[in-house]
């Protein structure tokens, strides 16, 4: 199929001191009250080019160390620390280092195969930056594509995206990236989170080959797609379309949207069950969490215990417990999904955003956007273990089980990296 045609797009990959640089476009927009400035007219994307390091000076990441490494810590590109039998809720977060870079404006951060770290940098940088476990840039993937190359236009149509969220396929071969909106002559110059259905154009998700760091697939979605998740069996991709008031369900093999499920105002978070048959989706504007059948594309039920403005959700490995950040309640909720009852709740900070669950599920990590803090919660009783002031606007978070490192995306242009250490190592 033409829309699954592999096409080399502009990628900046570092080999020693050499770079291959990509062109990008810049245009601002707003996100869930995170707006920085008034949207401007979008720049029409130009054709992709390849430039050598001699022609364009490289911009390098600046890594600032904070704490000395523990004796057991390595990057996840090699063997991780040994299993010492210490539960995550018996450890404490220690800040290791922070990373800044001229191309970094992270809305989200995701851990990939081999300890690679992916940051989605929206329309402010028009790229996905790839880091290794020590915060060095491995690649820069430009978000510009020609839709004709993917069978989505009869004529050449250069567009740029706005990478907002990402999900790694279970086999580790691909990264799926949602684009908040598209930029080009045929698109309006702005979009915002205070939308009604039909206010903005539909968008696309990209599939990226993680061996070549290439965009090798482009699939239509609804308007302003945000969070997305691949089913454990790898067959389906579920995308929450914020301004479409629905979710797209995509066949990952054929790269086609097989259908949409209408949910209501501002769907946001997604958590798919372990058998890949169903997905929980937060409907932030309707103050609801819906359960969707991924084969029939219907709503099975809604959780009454969802609370106000549920944003991000993570599901326990046994599918019994759902953790939800409730944005305007400043809390995290623990829900028994079978009984639809609230097990516990904890206030972590102002405007709770993204969540990450430790591999032993004994701890939950939370970013609090307006407070500029990161919280660690004990899941057995939903008590607060730590709150760490990181400043800025922490918005994305990811936990690397192999290294016990926690990566925090600061929307002001940083990554902050912690290690969850046994108390004796601190």
What are the roles of these predicted feature ranges?
Residues 2-4, 26-32:
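N-terminal acidic, proline/glycine-rich, low-complexity intrinsically disordered segments
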Residues 2-15:
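Bacterial N-terminal signal peptides that target proteins for export
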Residues 26-29, 40-45, 49-52, 60-66, ...:
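Predominantly soluble domains enriched in secretory-pathway, periplasmic, or organellar proteins
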Residues 22-24:
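C-terminal motif of bacterial Sec signal peptides marking the signal peptidase cleavage site
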Residues 3, 34-36, 46, 55:
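Intrinsically disordered, low-complexity polyampholyte segments enriched for Lys and acidic residues
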């Amino acid at each position: 199929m033409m829309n699954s045609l592999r096409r080399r797009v502009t990628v900046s990959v570092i080999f020693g001191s050499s770079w291959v640089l990509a062109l990008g476009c810049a245009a601002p927009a707003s996100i869930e009250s995170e707006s920085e400035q008034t949207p401007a007219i979008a720049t029409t994307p130009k054709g992709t080019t390849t430039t050598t390091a001699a022609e364009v000076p490289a911009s390098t990441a600046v890594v600032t160390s904070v704490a000395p490494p523990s004796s057991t810590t390595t990057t996840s590109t090699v063997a991780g620390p040994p299993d010492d039998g210490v539960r995550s809720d018996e450890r404490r977060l220690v800040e290791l280092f922070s990373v800044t870079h001229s191309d970094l404006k992270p809305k989200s951060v995701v851990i990939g195969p081999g300890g690679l770290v992916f940051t989605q940098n929206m329309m402010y940088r028009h790229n996905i930056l790839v880091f290794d476990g020590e915060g060095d840039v491995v690649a820069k993937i430009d978000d510009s594509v020609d839709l004709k190359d993917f069978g989505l236009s009869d004529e050449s149509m250069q567009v740029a995206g706005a990478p907002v969220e990402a999900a790694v396929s279970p086999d580790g071969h691909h990264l799926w990236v949602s684009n908040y909106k598209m930029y080009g002559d045929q698109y309006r110059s702005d979009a915002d989170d205070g939308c009604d259905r039909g206010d903005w154009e539909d968008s696309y998700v990209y599939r990226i080959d993680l061996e070549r760091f290439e965009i090798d697939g482009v699939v239509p979605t609804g308007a302003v797609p945000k969070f997305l998740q691949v089913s454990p069996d790898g067959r389906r991709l579920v995308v929450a379309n914020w301004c479409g008031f629905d979710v797209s369900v995509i066949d990952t093999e054929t790269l086609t949207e097989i259908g949409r499920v209408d949910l209501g105002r501002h769907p946001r978070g997604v958590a798919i069950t372990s058998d890949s048959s169903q997905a929980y989706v937060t409907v932030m504007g309707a103050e609801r969490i819906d359960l969707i059948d991924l084969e029939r594309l219907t709503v099975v039920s809604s959780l009454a215990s969802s609370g106000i403005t549920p944003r991000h959700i993570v599901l326990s490995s046994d599918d019994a417990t759902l953790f939800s950040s409730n944005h305007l309640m400043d809390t995290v909720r623990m829900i028994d999904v079978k009984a639809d009852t609230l097990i516990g709740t904890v206030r972590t900070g102002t405007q709770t955003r993204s969540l990450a669950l430790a591999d032993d599920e004994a701890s939950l990590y939370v970013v609090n956007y307006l407070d500029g803090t990161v919280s660690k919660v004990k899941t057995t009783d939903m008590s607060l273990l730590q709150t760490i002031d990181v400043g800025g606007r922490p918005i994305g978070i990811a936990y690397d089980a192999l290294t016990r490192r926690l990566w925090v995306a600061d929307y002001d242009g940083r990554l902050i990296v912690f290690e969850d250490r046994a108390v004796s190592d601190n």
